[in-house]
Amino acid sequence: MATTGLFEMNDKGKADKQKALECALAQIERQFGKGSIMKLGGDTPPPEIEATSTGSLGLDIALGIGGLPKGRIVEIYGPESSGKTTLTLHCIAEEQKKGGVCAFVDAEHALDPYYAKKLGVSLEDLLISQPDTGEQALEIVDTLVRSGAVSLVVVDSVAALTPKAEIEGDMGDATVGAQARLMSQAMRKLTASIGRSNCMVIFINQIRMKIGVMFGSPETTSGGNALKFYASVRLDIRRTGAIKDRDEVIGNQTRVKVVKNKVAPPFREVEFDILYGEGISKVGELVDLGVKAGVVAKSGAWYSYGDERIGQGRENAKQFLRDNPDIAYEIEDKIRASHGLEFGVDPTAEDLTEE
């Protein structure tokens, strides 16, 4: 009898809690509007995270979802001339192929439109702004994101976002922490609107050295710590060597490490070639990743795909794939399938052209 009474009390307590919860939810919806709170696994499950390709197949695979996540903040940092802007221009070109509107906030006033065009960027459809102050730059970013019509915004770079107080002051005046405060406020304002509009914002950043560090890495990024916390993905890009044609340097060997990733496992690394005037070498990646995935067979110096030999040496194999885009697409499709990825857009013959 006592046990029955205890169960009845428990049931009554649960019913009271459920009633209180329903009242609280109803009050929240009255105050903030329908959809302001809901069950995560309800009638409308959360949508899958969309991704924009980086232009590098290896990096798309390393990021785990086939590219950089939409509706998130991304930070790309590294030393000078390591390929940061090149990588973001490839992202813009890939997003434009899908019909998205892209904007480039050029705080460094250093964008080369001819180079951007060579990487596949449609200059007619690219919005560009060259702001005078950091406040102006971030206000422009906020307005573009809130419009809901822009898919991708690139800020180049955080280090060049100079606070108004610093510009109006004299050379040598101390404005300690002004840039960090500016970035911290911008992150707080941007985060919610970025999520609602499903717009990706990429911040390019530079490396600085911390003074007096005895242990650990002395490197840090400019603009304070706010961006590190708010970014869903952080990429560390480095130049590891030079690519030579006889005695002439024609490009860089580049390594990218996924330092932070909120949408897939982090700390993956990938290497690819960046050729001067051409960008990321797609056919070079197909050869290297094809061998790793077992799609392309390598015996001595010879590369073969199925029963067909595609070249003796890496350069000859690359040339074969340039001349035979259909086979290149087959290889790419199989590499993507082996990692659970699919083509985002139908590729064109121009994607493999490297002059």
Curated annotation (Swiss-Prot):
<dbReference type="InterPro" id="IPR049428">
    <property type="entry name" value="RecA-like_N"/>
</dbReference>
<keyword id="KW-0234">DNA repair</keyword>
<keyword id="KW-0963">Cytoplasm</keyword>
<dbReference type="InterPro" id="IPR020588">
    <property type="entry name" value="RecA_ATP-bd"/>
</dbReference>
<dbReference type="GO" id="GO:0016887">
    <property type="term" value="F:ATP hydrolysis activity"/>
</dbReference>
<dbReference type="InterPro" id="IPR003593">
    <property type="entry name" value="AAA+_ATPase"/>
</dbReference>
<protein>
    <recommendedName>
        <fullName>Protein RecA</fullName>
    </recommendedName>
</protein>
<dbReference type="GO" id="GO:0005829">
    <property type="term" value="C:cytosol"/>
</dbReference>
<keyword id="KW-0233">DNA recombination</keyword>
<keyword id="KW-0067">ATP-binding</keyword>
<keyword id="KW-0227">DNA damage</keyword>
<dbReference type="GO" id="GO:0005524">
    <property type="term" value="F:ATP binding"/>
</dbReference>
<dbReference type="Pfam" id="PF00154">
    <property type="entry name" value="RecA"/>
</dbReference>
<dbReference type="GO" id="GO:0003684">
    <property type="term" value="F:damaged DNA binding"/>
</dbReference>
<dbReference type="InterPro" id="IPR049261">
    <property type="entry name" value="RecA-like_C"/>
</dbReference>
<dbReference type="GO" id="GO:0140664">
    <property type="term" value="F:ATP-dependent DNA damage sensor activity"/>
</dbReference>
<dbReference type="InterPro" id="IPR020584">
    <property type="entry name" value="DNA_recomb/repair_RecA_CS"/>
</dbReference>
<comment type="similarity">
    <text>Belongs to the RecA family.</text>
</comment>
<dbReference type="InterPro" id="IPR013765">
    <property type="entry name" value="DNA_recomb/repair_RecA"/>
</dbReference>
<dbReference type="InterPro" id="IPR020587">
    <property type="entry name" value="RecA_monomer-monomer_interface"/>
</dbReference>
<keyword id="KW-0742">SOS response</keyword>
<comment type="function">
    <text>Can catalyze the hydrolysis of ATP in the presence of single-stranded DNA, the ATP-dependent uptake of single-stranded DNA by duplex DNA, and the ATP-dependent hybridization of homologous single-stranded DNAs. It interacts with LexA causing its activation and leading to its autocatalytic cleavage.</text>
</comment>
<dbReference type="GO" id="GO:0006310">
    <property type="term" value="P:DNA recombination"/>
</dbReference>
<dbReference type="InterPro" id="IPR023400">
    <property type="entry name" value="RecA_C_sf"/>
</dbReference>
<keyword id="KW-0547">Nucleotide-binding</keyword>
<dbReference type="GO" id="GO:0003697">
    <property type="term" value="F:single-stranded DNA binding"/>
</dbReference>
<dbReference type="GO" id="GO:0009432">
    <property type="term" value="P:SOS response"/>
</dbReference>
<dbReference type="GO" id="GO:0006281">
    <property type="term" value="P:DNA repair"/>
</dbReference>
<feature type="binding site">
    <location>
        <begin position="78"/>
        <end position="85"/>
    </location>
    <ligand>
        <name>ATP</name>
    </ligand>
</feature>
<keyword id="KW-0238">DNA-binding</keyword>
<dbReference type="InterPro" id="IPR027417">
    <property type="entry name" value="P-loop_NTPase"/>
</dbReference>
<dbReference type="Pfam" id="PF21096">
    <property type="entry name" value="RecA_C"/>
</dbReference>
